[in-house]
């Protein structure tokens, strides 16, 4: 059994309680305008190229079977349309200008890496988080991985956008200790405008997961011009007040730090000029949501 992944991040402290290791899966059913991990959207392999890091060594030209790299008078030319995603160029790149997103990892390989820091999990109350992309697009792998981790006493957290069939969640529920659940907008039409899909399934899945009794942390990416108006914030607070097992709501500030990622992948940055919300705006939203009986905090303070 293998998974398509983009990264494994150790000593993650914002992906659940304690010190954690986060496995990032590739592929997502949504396409959020503000996505800060654009390399995780597509299910296909993608090669990232950062021209400012290229030293012109030509090692990539020598190993590329598709002739997707050229070194000429104008420097390094990457012909993306010719790239086959084999990753050979990344292996020999001396300047770290090339990075392949979308590699295979076996269940045993992932488990062994994730267990390397078990002592830190135990001393900090941490564990393992799976994120993405959307990990539930590879639910069978997550189920098998979480089962092994639970059998060895490791806390498991699932970071999800909610836009998958509930039957996929049913596979992992027995082995999941915590959900990190995204809520992007309460209005379905505006939700679809922002991420490409309506929100009915997401809201329905949240209510079902709440009934399992598993801890849920809600994450609201707070994006000026998208979901920062009072009507939307109150709508989210009112909806969340139905849930009984939400540990807290984190109002996460939008940031534009992913601009270089979009450029390196030759992807359109669909929200490039929006400023990050102020501390005052984050606190205001958290206070409104808290007024509905759900603990909410600013993502900058937690």
Feature-to-residue mapping (PLM):
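Auxiliary Fe-S-binding modules of radical SAM enzymes
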Residues: 2-17, 211, 224-302
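N-terminal pre-triad scaffold of radical SAM enzymes
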Residues: 5-59, 76-85
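N-terminal-biased segments
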Residues: 15-17, 24-25, 41-42, 46-47, ...
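Iron-sulfur cluster-binding cysteine motifs and their immediate structural context
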Residues: 33-40, 59-78, 88-104
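Conserved dinucleotide-binding and phosphotransfer motif residues
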Residues: 67, 96, 151-152, 212, ...
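Conserved AdoMet/S-adenosylmethionine-binding subsite of the radical SAM
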Residues: 108-264
């Amino acid at each position: 059994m293998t998974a398509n992944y983009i990264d494994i991040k150790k000593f993650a402290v914002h992906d659940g309680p304690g010190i954690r290791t986060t496995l990032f899966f590739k592929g997502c059913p949504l396409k959020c305008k503000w996505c800060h991990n654009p390399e995780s959207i597509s299910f296909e392999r993608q090669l990232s190229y950062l021209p400012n890091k290229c030293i012109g060594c030509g090692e990539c030209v020598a190993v590329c079977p598709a002739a997707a790299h050229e070194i000429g008078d104008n420097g390094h030319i990457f012909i993306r349309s010719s790239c086959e995603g084999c990753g050979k160029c990344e292996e020999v790149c001396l300047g770290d200008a090339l990075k392949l997103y979308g590699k295979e990892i076996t269940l045993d390989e992932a488990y062994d890496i994730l267990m390397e820091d078990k002592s830190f999990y135990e001393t900090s109350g941490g564990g393992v988080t799976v994120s993405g992309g959307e990990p539930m697009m590879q639910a069978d792998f997550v189920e098998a991985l979480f089962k092994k981790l639970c059998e060895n006493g490791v806390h498991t957290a699932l970071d999800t956008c909610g836009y998958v069939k509930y039957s996929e969640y049913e596979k992992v529920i027995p082995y999941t200790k915590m959900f990190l659940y995204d809520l992007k907008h309460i209005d379905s039409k505006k939700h679809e405008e922002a991420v490409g899909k309506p929100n009915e399934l997401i809201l329905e899945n949240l209510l079902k997961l709440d009934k399992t009794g598993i801890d849920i942390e809600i994450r609201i990416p707070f994006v000026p011009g998208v979901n920062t108006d009072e009507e939307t914030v109150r709508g989210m607070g009112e909806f969340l007040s139905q849930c009984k097992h939400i540990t807290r709501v984190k109002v996460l500030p939008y940031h534009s730090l992913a601009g270089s990622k979009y450029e390196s992948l030759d992807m359109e940055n669909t929200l490039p000029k929006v400023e990050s919300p102020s501390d005052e705006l984050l606190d205001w939203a958290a206070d409104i949501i808290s007024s509905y009986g759900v603990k909410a905090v600013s993502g900058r303070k937690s």
